[in-house]
Regions:
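Terminal leader/tail segments of proteins
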Residues: 1-160
Length: 160
């Protein structure tokens, strides 16, 4: 018998129960952390604010399906940061910056799908900006300086 993922996801999002699990533990949650096959997938860090672990979210077809089910079930006022749950915020900012630079390199070489790359770059930049504000990152850090340089790089690549 298969467990109803919808009930588990609703219980996690609404915190209707302290713990929950599907058949054979394919998906479960304990408190603020939701697991896919015992790997941390989502973690609530504040009301209506979650981290989606990008390293785990695409690990398998099933985990990718879990991710999409959860994202579709979340209310529109929820903020989801796509980073690594167990990393410190500065490491995550550096990862975001690296990801955006990679997206910019794809954008500059793209032809027919340039608008999609541009949209992805801008969405990720806004998400990073929100992440930095949420964690009140010290402006003297190297990670923050790298973030500030991104705007210039984006401007020069004409992807703003």
């Amino acid at each position: 018998m298969s467990y109803n993922y919808t009930t588990l996801i609703d219980n996690y999002i609404n915190q209707s129960a302290p713990i929950g699990s599907t058949a054979e533990g394919r998906m479960s949650f304990r408190g603020d952390t939701l697991y896919s096959y015992k790997s941390k997938l989502f973690q609530r860090i504040a009301p209506n604010t979650y981290i989606l672990d990008v390293a785990i979210s695409k690990y398998s077809v099933t985990t990718a399906k879990h991710t999409m089910r959860i994202l579709r079930a979340m209310p529109s006022n929820v903020t989801v940061y796509r980073t690594c749950i167990d990393n410190d915020p500065i490491s995550n900012v550096i990862d975001y910056v690296s990801d955006i630079k990679y997206l910019i390199s794809k954008f500059t070489r793209a032809r027919s799908i340039k608008p999609q790359w541009q949209k992805q770059i801008n969405r990720t930049y806004v998400e990073l900006q929100s992440y930095i504000e949420f964690y009140k990152l010290d402006k003297r850090t190297t990670a923050y300086r790298q973030f500030k340089q991104l705007f210039t790089i984006m401007f020069e690549a004409k992807c703003l």
